[in-house]
Swiss-Prot record:
Binding site for Zn(2+): 395, 398, 413, 418
Organism in which the protein naturally occurs: Streptococcus pneumoniae (strain 70585)
Gene Ontology molecular function, alphabetical: DNA binding; DNA ligase (NAD+) activity; metal ion binding
Cofactor(s) the protein needs: Mg(2+); Mn(2+)
Chain segments annotated as transmembrane: none
Xref: Gene3D superfamilies: 5' to 3' exonuclease, C-terminal subdomain (1.10.150.20), 6.20.10.30, BRCT domain (3.40.50.10190), DNA ligase/mRNA capping enzyme (3.30.470.30), Helix hairpin bin (1.10.287.610), Nucleic acid-binding proteins (2.40.50.140)
Function of the protein: DNA ligase that catalyzes the formation of phosphodiester linkages between 5'-phosphoryl and 3'-hydroxyl groups in double-stranded DNA using NAD as a coenzyme and as the energy source for the reaction. It is essential for DNA replication and repair of damaged DNA.
Name of this protein: DNA ligase
């Protein structure tokens, strides 16, 4: 029976690849169904012999308890956006300062959800959401139900790949029709539908909704020397790669491709929101490197957003956690990019003055970045009133005088005891990218604050289970879960805490870099600003902001109270030792190591202060080689780069 099961699995997987990947099926649907039923019968009779790559794993039927957090071995960065030809020219100019004659590759920007797939010996072991780029959610069981994701590869290798999971337009129409017939609310657009599907705990629902993928990058160190070759290799392994792409030598060629794609966009069977432009050569990518948030070798051109007219009804003013007062327009409802919009940001007082926005104006509304509704401009021909908008002089939360500094575009409340700022700071502290306290969302925080149960973030860790029962709508089970989530967050690595403190200019990526270097918040507290400013990708603005924050008496008291309540202040990831043997060196691993796993070798190099990259370039300091090192060894020798072997690495 085992032989026949192997034959059936191989046949069915081949036919599935022909259907979903190549769009060239060699058997009829009825023949596929007959073989599939035969396999199901054999697996029912011999469950102990079910193969890891059996297509029956895709049917669903498993109900999950939830999704566990998963740390990405290779971080997922965001891309810098471009919205005009001029911004593409500026990107090209920056690249050419480092790379004399770059070739670019242009790929479609799929409007879906970023995913990371990890394979060991060619078998899918983890499928993970992007999350914050460092930590995502393990949705492996759901991604196994996406029919074009291979459960096994054509080669038995360890590899991590990146891609987009999306819902084709035809599937979206079918899903919404079914929801309409069942009296359920329809999804606003295919991206929302894909996101909702991947968050399903019932894998059978995922299997029915016909999601699809395009893979676009090998995240683990690649043996290819260009993005184009990498895409072809992904196809060889069994992944679906979008065929619509070009190589370009200049911005004229890129712009022509963008115009062509823009005209074809509505006829595609899936949604796209732009074109991604990357430097094709991987060694040049290494030379260009990264900022804190994004690669310097890529940019995402975004298509112009859809625009609609709406009438301005009124303006609300709200205070953020840094004291900035933001105006929001209340509008007559309009349909915009698949959703109903009745509120849109007016950004700040300077923007209102610049656009000359007045009471009852008809305005043009769009979605900035296809996400945030914003007022773009006034339709002056439809103006009905010359009366200007009322600009507040006092904080809408604490009534303190508002200030408008010369170097800032927004009004600001500088009262440190402003209730709105404190509450927004608490919400930020508990958010996913910060301390990630499940269940402690804005509504619960507002109730805790109103009940005077929390005044600062340290108070969160003084809460007891019974405190939550004082809040309207919170039952015993929810109170227990909230308390447990707060206790669990005490064990977070310290970069989550640092970001959660809401220090100006210190984002999540900067927090991680700081803690990798200083190892604990207490060490960072003692550091001088010159040392902070010297860290690669950071600088004087962040250093000054930290110095200002830590100079306040309140920050010292808060850190002491957090430590007393049991909150971890130490970094739990891979740290950088300033005086380590390889501190500050860029190292490439290549070839097959005999004794160390590649992941072990990478971890050891990083623990010794090295930055491990995938391609050899002029910025590479050292190459560690194993057997069959190939082109990377040859390039290192051509560039005169130091070469060492596995035994040398083990001796350190």
């Amino acid at each position: 029976m085992n032989k026949r099961m192997n034959e059936l699995v191989a046949l069915l997987n081949r036919y599935a690849t022909e259907y979903y990947t190549s769009d060239n099926p060699s058997v009829s649907d009825s023949e596929y169904d007959r073989l599939y039923r035969e396999l199901v019968e054999l697996e029912t009779a011999y469950p102990e012999q079910v193969l890891a790559d059996s297509p029956t794993h895709r049917v669903g039927g498993k109900v999950l308890d939830g999704f566990e957090k998963y740390s990405h071995q290779y971080p997922l960065y965001s891309l810098q956006d471009a919205f005009s030809r001029e911004e593409l020219d500026a990107f090209d100019a920056r690249v050419r300062k480092e790379v004399a004659h770059p070739t670019y590759i242009c790929e479609l920007k799929i409007d879906g959800l970023s995913i990371s797939l990890t394979y060991e010996k060619g078998i899918l072991v983890a499928g993970v959401t992007r999350g914050d780029g460092s930590i995502g959610e393990n949705i492996t069981e759901n991604l196994k139900r996406v029919k074009d994701i291979p459960l096994t590869l054509t080669e038995e290798l360890d590899i991590t790949v990146r891609g987009e999971c999306y819902m084709p337009r035809a599937s979206f129409d079918q899903v919404n029709q079914a929801r309409q017939e069942n009296g359920e609310p329809e999804f606003a657009n295919p991206r929302n539908a894909a996101a909702g599907t991947l968050r399903q705990l019932d894998t059978a629902v995922v299997a029915k909704r016909n999601l699809a993928t395009f893979l676009y990058q090998e995240a683990s160190p690649s043996t290819r020397d260009s993005q184009e070759k990498g895409l072809k290799y992904l196809e060889q392994l069994g992944f679906v790669v979008n065929p619509k792409r070009i190589l370009a030598e200049n911005i004229d060629e890129i712009w022509n491709f963008i115009q062509e794609v823009g005209q074809e966009r509505e006829n595609l069977p899936y949604d796209i929101d732009g074109v991604v432009i990357k430097v094709n050569d991987l060694a040049s990518q290494e030379e260009l490197g990264f900022t804190v948030k994004a690669p310097k070798w890529a940019v995402a051109y975004k298509f112009p957003a859809e625009e609609k007219e709406a009438q301005l009804l009124s303006v609300d003013w709200t205070v953020g956690r840094t004291g900035v007062v933001t105006p929001t327009a209340n509008l007559t409802p309009v349909q915009l990019a698949g959703t109903t919009v009745s509120r849109a940001t007016l950004h700040n007082v300077d923007y209102i003055a610049e656009k000359d926005i007045r009471k009852d104006d008809t305005v043009i509304v769009y979605k900035a970045g296809d996400i945030i509704p914003a007022v773009l401009r006034v339709v002056e021909s439809k103006r009905v009133s010359e009366e200007k908008l009322d600009i507040p002089t006092n904080c809408p939360s604490c009534n303190s005088d508002l200030l408008h500094f010369e170097d800032e575009v927004a009004l600001r409340c500088i009262n440190p005891r402003c209730p709105a700022q404190i509450m927004e700071g608490l919400i930020h502290f508990a958010s996913r990218d910060a301390m990630n306290i499940t269940g402690l969302g804005p509504s619960i925080v507002e109730k805790l604050f109103a009940a005077n149960l929390v005044k600062d973030v340290a108070d969160i860790y003084r809460l007891q289970e019974e405190d939550f029962l004082l809040l309207e709508g919170v039952k015993e089970k929810s109170a227990a879960k909230l308390y447990q989530a707060i206790q669990a967050s005490k064990e977070n690595s310290a970069e989550k805490l640092l970001f959660g403190l809401g220090i100006r200019h210190v984002g999540s990526k900067a927090s991680q870099l700081l803690l990798q270097y200083f190892h604990s918040i207490e060490n960072l507290y003692q550091a001088d600003s010159e040392e902070v400013a010297s860290i690669e990708s950071l600088g004087g603005v962040i250093a000054k902001s930290l110095q200002t924050y830590f100079a306040t008496e309140g920050s010292e008291i808060l850190l002491r109270e957090l430590k007393e309540t049991g909150v971890n202040l130490d970094y739990k990831g891979q740290t950088v030792v300033a005086d380590a043997a390889l501190s500050g060196l860029t190292v490439v691993l290549t070839g097959k190591l005999e004794r160390l796993k590649r992941s072990e070798a990478k971890s050891k190099l990083e623990s010794l202060g090295a930055k491990v990259t995938g391609s050899v370039s002029k910025k590479t300091d050292l190459v560690v080689v194993g057997a069959d090192a190939g082109s990377k060894l040859q390039k290192a020798q051509e560039l005169g780069i130091q070469v060492r072997d596995e035994a040398w690495l083990e001796s350190l």
